[in-house]
Amino acid sequence: MSSQAAAFAPHVDHSAVTGRSLDLDGRRFYQISAYDQIPPFFMTLVGASNLWLFISSTGGVTAGREHADRALFPYYTEDKVAEGAGRTGGLSVLRVGLPDASVVCWQPFAETRPGDPAVERNLAKDYLGTTLVFTETRADLGLRLRVAWQTSARYGVVRSCELTSV
């Protein structure tokens, strides 16, 4: 396993990784559960325009219009895109108030370290290849964040987030 893969999956448990089809918002997706337990991998999203988007399972993104010289995010190799998580693409940081009046800072999809609270991560891509959905659940906070990536001829790269109670 590469050092990059080890950084994002330090305690690899391949038995936890499963795949299945599911319906999400009325569309068919293929979901990989516990995707963070395997080495990072590269994906592409397609659309009806000249926009291209490549995204790593770490969250790093490269995208542009027509060709590499018109990149919106830096056009790098797969390993550099994977390492770019948190610098390219999206970043979510949530301040969560607890019943005892304390505040917890939660950064979904960040690299986990020993001693961090348990998280459940899933990754789903629709069968047309137009939408990619990252989901992280923090059971201790009772929260789930779903982040969807899509391309749009009109709006370009579209990232949407949905925070729900579980």
Task: Give residue spans per PLM region.
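Anionic coordination/interaction segments
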Residues: 1-166
